């Protein structure tokens, strides 16, 4: 009797359940699943959906599809299985940051995006079982809106001292040896570990490039123990249903909310120090010039995920709500794009412009 092969989704669910039920289990035999055509094809589809620019080889999705997706993926599969796969150099692109400085994105070629995506599809199933609920960035079924909603919830539950944390060049400071150790706690497949090492070391001796599919997962793995430390603090400092400290992270954007009650005086400073102590062994530094502590009871605002948040009284003055507005630079950018669209519209019908 022929055994029906399981789908990629079923495989990921099985891996997740195993990881969830056995928190110290180290997985092996994963490389076979990474190199399966179904995994590579799904990784290609995800890369195609994002429709990024070509990498250093100049090859676009249109070029690949003209020559044939299956031959393209077969070539990747054969390189991986033969042990001769080598990532190409990334194409560097600079984009402006909100503060006027430039951020360097490193764009892998599509071939390498597919390999990273296949690796992510399998490893994500393991580490999703380990990740803390207070982490929201680049995770399945999680979004910036959920992170913002939880920050608002913390403020409404009287955690009114806000630590707006800025990490200094987080992705550039991730230490490869520490990241590999963290992954190896769950993975004992030498071929997978070799592939991870190839990907993260392709751009230098320290840091991981922003722009590849694997980087967000690696960044979450790196800070997961910090996330759980603050979840423990949240539980230990809670009094019944009332929490005194809450922590929210989206990639490298962190907010810590602390009770403004007089009995909790000094707790915010202790929370910030604890964060510094947790980050120091990882080589991650706080940007002390930009990390700020604000009191929303005094009408002070703070930024999170492109929004300015402020606590203001409601119309009847018998309560309050958290007001969110896109940051000024974001509003200016959107207005400029709308203006450009209108100016370039010419005599187009309104429905086409919309």
Label every PLM stretch briefly:
Residues 1-70:
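Non-catalytic, polymerase-adjacent accessory regions of viral genome-replication enzymes
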Residues 117, 121-134:
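Electropositive, glycine- and tryptophan-enriched low-complexity nucleic-acid-binding patches
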Residues 35-45, 198-206, 292, 349-353:
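Short, hydrophobic/aliphatic alpha-helical segments
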Residues 72-75, 79-94, 98, 130-296, ...:
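Conserved polymerase palm-domain catalytic core
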Residues 104-105, 109, 320:
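Conserved phosphate-binding loops in nucleotide/dinucleotide-binding enzymes
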Residues 56, 121, 165-167, 260, ...:
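Residues immediately flanking
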Residues 201, 282-353:
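A conserved non-catalytic segment of reverse transcriptases
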Residues 110-118, 346:
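Duplex nucleic acid-engaging cores and interfaces of nucleic-acid transaction enzymes
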């Amino acid at each position: 009797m022929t055994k029906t092969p399981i789908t990629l989704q079923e495989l990921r669910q099985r891996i997740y359940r195993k990881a969830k039920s056995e928190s110290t289990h180290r997985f092996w035999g994963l490389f076979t699943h990474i190199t399966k055509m179904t995994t590579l094809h799904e990784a290609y589809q995800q890369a195609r959906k994002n429709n990024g620019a070509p990498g250093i080889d100049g090859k676009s999705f249109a070029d690949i599809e003209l020559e044939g997706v299956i031959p393209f993926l077969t070539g990747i599969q054969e390189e991986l299985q033969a042990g001769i796969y080598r990532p190409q150099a990334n194409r560097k692109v600079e984009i402006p940051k909100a503060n006027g400085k430039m951020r360097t994105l490193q764009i892998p070629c599509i071939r390498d995006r597919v390999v990273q995506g296949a690796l992510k599809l399998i490893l994500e199933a393991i580490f999703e079982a380990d990740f803390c609920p207070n982490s929201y960035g680049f995770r399945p079924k999680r979004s910036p809106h959920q992170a913002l909603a939880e920050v608002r919830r913390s403020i409404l539950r009287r955690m009114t001292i806000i630590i707006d944390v800025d990490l200094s060049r987080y992705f550039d400071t991730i230490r490869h040896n520490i990241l590999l150790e963290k992954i190896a706690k769950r993975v004992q497949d030498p071929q997978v570990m070799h592939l991870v090492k190839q990907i993260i070391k392709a751009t230098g001796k320290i840091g991981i490039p922003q722009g590849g599919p694997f980087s967000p997962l690696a960044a979450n793995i790196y800070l997961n123990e910090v996330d759980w430390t603050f979840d423990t603090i949240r539980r230990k400092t809670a009094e019944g249903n009332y929490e005194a400290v809450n922590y929210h992270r989206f990639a490298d954007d962190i907010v810590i909310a602390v009770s403004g009650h007089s009995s909790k005086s000094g707790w915010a400073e202790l929370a910030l120090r604890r964060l510094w102590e947790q980050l120091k062994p990882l080589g991650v530094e706080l940007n002390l010039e930009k990390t700020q502590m604000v009191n929303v009871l005094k009408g002070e605002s703070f930024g999170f995920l492109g929004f300015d948040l402020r606590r203001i009284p409601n119309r009847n003055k018998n309560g309050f709500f958290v007001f969110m507005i896109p940051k000024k630079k974001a509003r200016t950018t959107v207005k400029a794009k709308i203006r450009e669209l209108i100016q370039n519209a010419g005599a187009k019908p309104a429905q086409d412009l919309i």
